[in-house]
Amino acid sequence: MNTGLRRGELLALRWESVDFGLQLLTVEGGTAKNRQTRHVALNESATRLLKQWQEQVGGKQRVFEVTTGFKSAWAPLLRRAMITKFRWHDLRHHFASRLVQKGVPLNTVRDLLGHSSVGMSLRYAHLAPDQRREAVAKFD
């Protein structure tokens, strides 16, 4: 939820693409939807969780090794959490929505999500009405 990665990007992520020192992960172009490599900053929470996960899984190459179907692996967790109608993309949408609500510029949201144009990120613009008021207030 704190990275905005697509499911395929997350499942393809390798430990060598995670830089704990810089708090950065690299989504390789071959796994990205638009085929362009991008760098995603990690917040403290995501960094801490990834470090803990790395300690648990040991020397695996991929961050998340999925040996069974992805949906079947998540199903028991979702049931226990009483989450219904879950779609992986909702986590990505939540990430983008929170960024916009916190005042992050749409072009930065575009970069983090790996959208090829800011137009894709514009769907979240309605979540920041205060930014419009703040923008015109600069003329006062």
Language-model-derived ranges and their functions:
Residues 1, 14, 22, 29, ...:
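Active-site proximal loops enriched in glycine and acidic residues that flank catalytic Cys/His/Asp
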Residues 3, 40, 48, 52-65, ...:
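Short, basic (Lys/Arg/His-rich) helix/loop patches that form interaction surfaces
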